[in-house]
Amino acid sequence: MTDEKRAFPKGNNHIRSETFNGSVSHKISESIKDIASLRPHGKYTVQDIDNIIASTSSHENRGQSGDSNGCINHDEEGDIPMCDLNDESDVEMISEYLSSQREMEAQSVANYMPKINDDLPLLNPPTLKTAFVVDTNFIISHLNTLEKLRSLSSTYHHLIIVPTTVIQELDGLKKSPDIARDNDDTTNQEHDRTIGTLARWGNDWIYKNLANLDSGLIGQKLKQSLNPGSLKDDSILDCCLYFKEILNCFVILLSNDKNLCTKALTEDILTVSFRKNMDAKIIAMRAYEENQLRFANLRDSTVNNFDQNVTSYAHIPGIETPPLQFDKVSQNVFEQVKETIFFAIDHTLRKEYGEDIGFIDYNPDKLTTIENASNYIYLFWVSVFSELFTCSKIKKNEWKSLPTVLKSKPTNLNDLRTFEQFWETVLHFLFSKFTNEEKQSLEKQIHEWKTSINAIST
């Protein structure tokens, strides 16, 4: 049987294939004992053995002595090795290696679709959900940082999303014999490891966390794509855009691929790439702060001013107290319009998102005021409602600050007419894709409102 080396661009001296030399078996045995003595419950894994073989083979002439575990950490149960590559040249090499693999294996990637467990965990962040979309090179180069970032998900209200393409690429790399070598022998204790070993560690980490619904990590569903035919870098960017535009998330791309990061930045998607001494907590904290800075006001303004607006309007000097009959009609029309608005928004969002409704920043229990409802229209304007209002002059920003007369119970006849006419127009747009039966029910309701208003104006 012959050993075939995988093709790789010329001029790169970081990748090489090596075979196991039986003469170092004693060193391997001793290294396994060293690892077992340091690991919880004396555990060691197949990946540890792979790592020791590569490490011992490449360093047998350097006089290594029992340092095979290097800078490798493990998860809490001691099952999955976690490491970060701290040398910038190594990180760049991994990125270039994966780019070359994407060019060579584009067709095979397109034809392979592994099934993954991607049920959504129940998270309730205070603002738009932060979604870290992770590239293959980031998993291979910075698995330890990713694990720490995942462990902070409940504290900083974020998710890590693994695109389908990344799972495919890791699966294709798991048998690669090529070695990611650290050149700086004097300052870095990381040992040579094969790309296949690093890919298997990444696969194990993804599998373990996908099996846990509360892990803070999910996989991209096959239907969660704007362009299902996209490949390689474009498919990862497509994943980012889906979660940004359709599921209304605050998306941050984790990648060391400069070309992919450039594409993401042109789409207004923030990116995080390798930096010396990169820290997961700082990444999580800054992402949370940026989320708050950009989107907190959307929710803060929803409820706080409603009661104040109604009260201040009701006590403006000079407004006459309407007769009892007007009060009754105004109250009935106001409540019925409000409930119809709530129904239209809830129905539209559920029809658009289906089973993903629990993932978006929508809570039907908070549909308690017209101001709340208008904020949901504002929040989902780009992804849902703008299409319904194509022929309307109403713009997105107008939903953020509707006049009080359009949000509260009318206190005089002119305000009641204005209120009814505005929401009649809006409801026609909201119902534009409803069934004919639902549209007929709306027209019947509108007719009753107009009849009641006309009755008290004569």
UniProtKB/Swiss-Prot annotation:
Is Transcription among the key words of this record? Answer: yes
Q: From what superkingdom does this record's organism come?
A: Eukaryota
Q: For the PINc domain, which residue ranges apply?
A: 130-262
Q: Which UniProt keywords apply?
A: Activator, Nucleus, Transcription, Transcription regulation
The answer to whether keyword Transcription regulation applies is yes
**Main localization category:** nucleus
Drop me one GO molecular function for this one: RNA endonuclease activity
InterPro entries assigned to the protein according to its UniProt record, in alphabetical order: PIN-like_dom_sf (IPR029060), PIN_dom (IPR002716), SWT1_C (IPR049014), SWT1_Regulator (IPR052626)
Q: Please, one GO biological process term?
A: nuclear mRNA surveillance of mRNP export
What does UniProt give as GO cellular component?
cytoplasm; nucleus
Location(s) in or outside the cell: Nucleus
Give the family this protein belongs to, as stated in its UniProt record: Belongs to the SWT1 family.
Which PANTHER family is this protein grouped with?
Answer: TRANSCRIPTIONAL PROTEIN SWT1 (PTHR16161:SF0)
Q: How does it assemble?
A: Interacts with the TREX complex and RNA polymerase II.
Q: What does this protein do?
A: Involved in transcription. Probably functions as a transcriptional activator.
The extra comment attached to this record reads:
Deletion causes a slow growth phenotype on synthetic medium at 37 degrees Celsius and leads to decreased transcription. Deletion has no effect on ribosome biogenesis or frequency of recombination. Deletion is synthetically lethal with a deletion of each of the THO complex subunits HPR1, MFT1, THO2, and THP2.
Q: What is this protein called?
A: Transcriptional protein SWT1
Traced from the root, the source organism's taxonomic lineage reads:
Eukaryota, Fungi, Dikarya, Ascomycota, Saccharomycotina
